[in-house]
Each structure stands twice: as structure tokens, then as C-alpha cells.
Amino acid sequence: MVYRLIDELICYGIKNQLVDTVDEVYVKNRLLELFELDAYEKSDFDGEARPVNEILEDLMKVAHEKGIMEEDTITMKDLFDTKIMGMLTPLPSVVQRTFAEKYTESPKEATDYYYAFSQATNYIRKDRIAKDEKWVTDTEYGPIDITINLSKPEKDPRDIAKAGKAKASGYPSCLLCRENEGYAGHFNHPARQNHRIVPMTLGGEDYYLQYSPYVYYNEHCIIFNKEHIPMKINKATFEKLLEFVEKFPHYTAGSNADLPIVGGSILSHDHFQGGNYTFAMARAPYEKMFVMKEWPNVTAGIVKWPMSVIRLQGKDLAEIADAADHILKTWRGYTDKEAFIFSETDGTPHNTITPIARMRGDLLELDLVLRNNITTEEHPMGVYHPHSEYHHIKKENIGLIEVMGLAVLPARLKKEMADLETALLQGADIRGDEVLAKHADWAEKWMSENEVNSENIHGIVQAEIGKVFAKVLECAGVYKRTEEGMKAFDRFVEVIK
């Protein structure tokens, strides 16, 4: 059985250009060593390899039966199957050389190769990504994307216990650091033997390209600094983002903001995120144009979007970065008490920007999303953050991906929504249900507005979740979509013109 699986895995590796036929015997011997076998026996494998997750699942059963893999928990299996795939994955030098060769043909050819490679190695676990629920909801801002993220597996209690006992090594410093490439991992850190990164230069500094293993959208990539240095939004950030989309014109690239609440989950390591995807925000049109007198060649305007966005367009990277820097510096020091915008309180800064770059035809485009992280007693998690009436759907920070119009919602919603649908169809008392009670006000509202039945309830629930997400983005907008809010936005525009 095990010899057949080894043959099947090597066949998969050759077919997916991970293993060169020259290296076939070498890889086979490494796998024999891993499975504590001294000899090889020819199997009856017929040459048709299954998807890699199925082959690995069978190999792990063998490893568990033989006592090579102690327990069959999710974390243990992830550590072990990544170790297996690491034996098939080419050295970093090979991947970097191939990427560079493909790039000379075209940037798209290079990323096509690298994305296919990152899936073939099982670094991107396609079988898990396929579990994510995705749909599109029409809103006044156009169609927006909703996903319920199910690809991160729940931790097994045995794994949690082991992780609690494990010593913190501090190596690699975080999940983004380049030292992850080839790292074996442990109970508190994922294995990355099958992980390969691609070097590049942005703004004269060393960066690396990789894909997100969770792929929230097509070719979801991360561009991270060689050094473990904190996130910072400044003129250099704008220049680097614009330079990246010049190098990869089919990709978008943005950065999370550099302050808590409005920033992402990793503020400690300078990085951007991008990918080959047209976000709803990119489809949103200009709503109001204005001219910046020092940068007449840069097209500027407010975008029709639930958050407060200024879009800059032009052909000259330096001019756009200059204009963006002027807006950033002005915003960092800007206070408008009437609009409840305070640049700082007690010396703590509140204003920053979430920037997103893309090519639009032959024009460079930079969207600047105005952010503010002030908190109050009424809104302790943030005034410009999802408000409490929407926490039953989304209470987490609104980071870069959400800003662009893609909701990444917690896995708990899948079961909660299924249970809610069943309860409503049965006429059950959801207010008396410990888990579902939080959805009661929301559900009652749309139940009264629709003729709900078993055929349409799922579609209605999805559409209503989408509407909540649009409202959540409005919460995060510093200038509200009201007459008063737009007048306040105009006041800021007058200052930057």
C-alpha cells in the first residue's frame, strides 16, 4: 500500500512540474526514509494520480498506523503532510530562476506559473479553500463580494493543549518573515517546507512576493519587507505600491493602515496585499472631481463608495505619490470637531490612510481611504468601526480587503445562518435561543419585508448579510453618506486643493 502511494505522489510531482525525472530516485529514497522503509518494492500503480490531498490523507493513515505520526489531529497532520510535500518542492533558487525567466516573457506568465506552483505544492490547500462560502450582493454601491471563511480549520483540543506547553522560540519572528521558507513548524507555528518566496525590489528596498495560503480572492498575494519592521504609511508606501502595479499591471496592491482598529492583524511586519482580482471598489466611479493646484496633471476626485475615498489618476508615478503624500500629511493633522474628526487626543494620533494602487489602462491609479481610529464610551471598539447593532454579523476590524469591498466573515455564521433559517421556517422562538437571539431584531425586520419560504430563505439571508456589510463599511467611513457628511468631506477637499 505505502509503495503504491509513494509512486502515486511522485507521479503527481512529475506531472505538476515539482519533481524532475532526473530527481525521481532521490525523492523516492527521501520518502522511504520518512516512512522508515529500508527497501523499495514496485507497486501496481497505474500512472493516474488523484488530487494531492487524497494521496496525502492515505499516506498520513499509514504514518499514524506505524507510529511515525503520533496523533491524527489537524495540526499534527498539517505538520506532517507539509513535511512530505517539502520533499517534492524544488529549492528556492530553482523557483526564483523559473519566475525570473517567465517574467522576461510577461509578468502574467510569471505569476501564472507561481500561483499554479503554490497550489501544486499544497501550500495553498485547494480542498480547504473550496469550502469557503461565496456570493455577491447588489447594493447602491454596485455588487459587493461576501465570503464566509471556512478554510482555516478549527483547532483540536489536543493541539491546543500541546501549543500551550510549547516554548515560544521567537523564530521566525512572525508568520510573514522570510525565515518561514522551508521551516518545519511546530504546534504554535505552521509548517512551511513547501513554501517558496520570490524576491523583488520596491523603492530600492528588498521585498518578497508570496501567495496567501488562505486565498480570499483570485491570486491573493502578499508583498513583504525582507526585514521584520513595523507597518508605516508614508510617501515611500505610495511609491512602492505604484511601482509594484507597474511591474505587475494585471495585479492590484494595497496596504493596511498603520494604526490599531483600522489596521490589519499584523502591524509588526511591513507588508502589502494584492492580487489578480477586480474588487467592487475598483468598479466604483468618481462622484465628484476636483483639481489640486500643485498637481494639475493628476486627476482627483471623491469616489462613490460607503467609505471616504479620494482617487488619484495619472501617468507620472512621482507626481501621484507627491499628491498622495500631501493628502496624507494634511489628513494626519486634520481636525473637524463638527464632523467628529480629531487628529489626536491626549497625544495619541487617530488619522491615517488605507492606500490601494492599480493600473487602469495606461494610467496609474491610487485610492486613498481616509481612516480614523478614535474610540468613545459609546463606541469602545471605534467610532469608525462596525457599530454594535451589526456585531452579530461582523465585529472584527475593517481591514484592506473589506475596504475594497470583499467581506471576510467568521466561520461561525455558516452554522448560525443554517440554524436561523430552520428556526424561522419552523416558527421557533429565536429570542429564547442562546446563540440565535443576537440575530432576532435583524431577522424580524427582513421577515416582515419578504414572503419567506423554504425555497427563497437562503437567498434572502445572503442578500441581507450583504446589506449589513454595506452598512458596516458606512460605519467605517469617516464622512457619512448624508448631506451633512458630504459637506464635511468637501471642507477637507478645500484644504488639500
Regions found by a protein language model. Give the residues of each.
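Active-site microenvironments that recognize anionic phosphate/pyrophosphate groups
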Residues: 1-223, 227-230, 304-306, 320-324, ...
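Helical scaffold of the NTase/Pol beta-like nucleotidyltransferase catalytic core
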Residues: 194-196, 228-253
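Catalytic or ion-translocation cores adjacent to nucleophile or general acid/base/metal-coordination motifs
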Residues: 236, 245-265, 274-335
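Beta-rich nucleic-acid/ligand-interaction surfaces
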Residues: 260-268, 346-352
